[in-house]
Amino acid sequence: MPIDSQDAPRPLPDRPNLRHLKDQARALVKAGEAATLSAAQFQLARLYGFTSWPKLKAHVDSLEASMREAAELKQAIDTNALGRVKALMTRNPELHRAPLGYGENGPLTWVAECRVPWEAPTAARLEMAQWMIDNGSDVHQGGDGPLMRAALVDSRIPMMELLLQNGANVNAEWNGYFPIIFAPCETLEPGALKWLLDHGANPNCGKAGRKYPDSALDYVIGTYSRSTNLGACIDTLLEAGCGSRRNMPVVVDLLRGRMDLLARHLDGDPMLIQKKFLELDFGSTAARRLTLRGATLLHVAAEYGNLEAAKMLVERGADINAAADLDEAGVGGQTPIFHAATQFYDWGLPVVEFLVERGADLSVAAKLPGHYERPDEFVDCSPLGYARLFPGKESKTVEFLREAGAAE
């Protein structure tokens, strides 16, 4: 490890370890870059911006002690041990700002999420949250992280109420880019969504230049979650006057599960059955980047596991094997079954079974977007091959496709 005294100080690792630093010092001696262990330790101290090894050691010892205390605090929270939480945080008030919870916002965020144990907030958990706020925890930590995490699940509304009573802001933007109202939109929790709206949350919260610039309605349409609650969430936002940049009534009514309105659209314009919608820039889920751009209404029904809509569309002449449009790079061309077969928790299996029963081609191949964490990845595969990749586990859907004779 060559050390140049002209270099700017190097930051310590996120979780510095004294043993690792000692090993680094020994490696310097072994490599001939320091004459003695003391000299090597001094070089390391200077490398990390300290004037001496004892000062570096004291700093790392302090950090390690803080991490141990934070781990103890998390264990106390997870077991709802209020007395232990009080003792730890009273002894060390800095624990109110310990890197716990989503985005390391703080212990209050972790308490509010009620993730461990996964349950509705108990009286003990609510008392814990109130004690933390009364004794130094910031209800706005991370941009109202506690309220954002509580709003992910309907059963946490009592926690949301407590946070609001203590000054939480329903119109805050977590981390500067995620409006609190987007939390129940992401997880499709209509109760928490309505609670936020009833308490002043603005659904028309679009902001140009933000990471997520759209309204709450646009966000709920684009979420990766799949649930029978989708229609209720859309209806709640429409009733609240939420707008959308998307002008596609037939698609929205399909997503709402309004078969009466879908039928009315199709009666008024039978060509909608075969239309390919270039504006559908949503539909990704199960870790894949594939969206519905250039796809048909049957693709939409397949993506959202809407068996009733799929049956209506096929009965009215929808092509089971309609291929979505290709982009300029030749990516796309997937048939509806690709969407139904690649869902978390076999959400699309009933639609897969229906499409196969009606003659879906299981040998068709397409070049499609890969994993969302690998933006340059594209894969050439069949419906079964895509289902094996996304969400990436053996499933009842994969088993069914194999039994149906699908090509790998």
What do the predicted segments below correspond to?
Residues 61-121, 126-128, 135-136, 256-260, ...:
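Extended repeat-based scaffolds of very large eukaryotic assembly and lipid-transport proteins
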Residues 87-95, 126-138, 161-169, 194-203, ...:
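Ankyrin repeat domain, specifically the short helix-to-loop turn at the C-terminus of the second helix
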Residues 80, 124, 154-155, 188, ...:
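Ankyrin-repeat intra-repeat helix-capping/turn positions
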Residues 66-75, 97-117, 140-152, 172-186, ...:
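Ankyrin-repeat boundary/"N-cap" motif
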Residues 102-103, 120-127, 154, 158, ...:
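Residues within HEAT/ARM-like alpha-solenoid scaffolds
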Residues 62-75, 199, 222-269, 349-353, ...:
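Ankyrin-repeat-protein effector appendages
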Residues 2-87, 91, 110:
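Intrinsically disordered, low-complexity eukaryotic regions enriched in glycine, serine
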